[in-house]
Amino acid sequence: MTRRPLLILLEFVLITGPLTWWWLHGGLESYYEIFQRLGFPLLAEMGVNTFNPGLVKDRMINFIPFLGLMLVTPGLGFVRRFVGLAVGMLLIFLSHVLLAYWAWASFERDGQAADSMAQFFPGLLLADAFPFIIWAVIANRVLAEMISNIMPRSASSTNSQSD
């Protein structure tokens, strides 16, 4: 039996709602402490000597939709789901490090210029999209099957099947 889309949406909200509340009430600060311990040394190796956390901290919440999508996607095997979660979380952490570097390169390294935000904006878009891209890569077979079930078959494929 397949799960209906509204049930999947409800499961997603039931998972991400409490996680978002937790994130806004202390989770971000806990994660930021981990980011300082693990991410700052990486940033220092990349030449970052000053850091404005306000440019990056708000984007760090993107763990939550990734986690929710990975948990509610039907048809993912246990191993693929578990390994996907682990690898995805690591990649999202590294994307936060790269976004911090991009912020530094856009605003701090060369001084704040009129085009600093224009240089930084693509990084924000990539940071927001990255968890969804990782999820789509991990769940590609499931997504392809779902899409093939809802897309009408073209006339040429229908004709070739009847021949």
Model-derived segments and spans:
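Membrane-interface helix-boundary motifs at transmembrane edges
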Residues: 2-3, 74-84
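C-terminal TM-helix exit segments that contain a strictly Trp-centered aromatic cap at the helix terminus
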Residues: 19-28, 94-106
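N-terminal signal-anchor transmembrane alpha helix
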Residues: 2-31
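Extracytosolic (periplasmic/ER-lumenal) interhelical loops and adjacent juxtamembrane/interface segments
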Residues: 30-51
